[in-house]
Amino acid sequence: MLVDSDGDGNTENDADLTGESVEWKDVAPGEYQINLSVMNSAGKMDGDKIKVYVSFYGHWSDSDWEIAGGNSNDPEEIQFDMPVMYDKEAGNTIRKVELILTYPQIDDDCQDVTPGEGNNCRNKLDIYAYNEEDEEARNTTETPLDGRDHGDCDDDDDCLQLLLSSYMFTETESTFGDGDWVVAIHNEKINDQKIESFVIILHYK
């Protein structure tokens, strides 16, 4: 028998937990309403409702991590799925998305393939963000090489940040909607390039 414990008319969305101390795991990012009920030893019950905001922090790094070479006509990408919720009526709205990419400015094993025509070994990676319809929403290509020093960045690294505001996930002619977005590390240079780390942060309050 299915029991609608939270009284919302849906018997499949209850995550009821009982006890003085409970663990609520495997929760997708977003906004949730918690209905708390407390019963004392005399059987008297009281309750309250609170909002809980679940954000997400994803960090990827590996000493051997690299992206294959590409070019401007056929860039190489490493893609990450990024579900985003913006539901104004339900009050479940993303506040912002923060993407941070760190990579070495020059790889130790790089060889300049076009000697005499500048330093081909100077790395340049970018972050791209695509909405559910695979439309390109934003990228970091216009960030100059000497401006890639976000946060506590080592002198030998580039540290690149891309911020996506909540407005970008609304439904207008000039915005891109919510849903199943994809973010990508993007390489248009012919050389393989090492990657130090990539971070995705979804802020829900």
For the regions a language model picked out, list residue spans one by one.
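Residue-level recognition of secondary-structure-to-loop junctions
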Residues: 5, 22-32
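Short beta-strand segments within Ig-like beta-sandwich modules, predominantly Fibronectin type-III
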Residues: 11-19
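C-terminal edge beta-strand
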Residues: 22, 44-55, 198-202
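Hydrophobic/tyrosine-rich beta-strand signature of extracellular beta-sandwich/beta-rich modules
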Residues: 36-38
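C-terminal edge strands of extracellular/lumenal beta-sandwich accessory domains
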Residues: 42, 58, 115-134, 171-205
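Low-complexity, Pro/Ser/Thr- and charge-rich linker/hinge segments at domain boundaries
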Residues: 54-77
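Acidic, Ser/Thr/Pro-rich low-complexity intrinsically disordered segments
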Residues: 72-150
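Noncatalytic modules at the cell exterior or secretory-pathway interfaces
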Residues: 94-95, 147-192
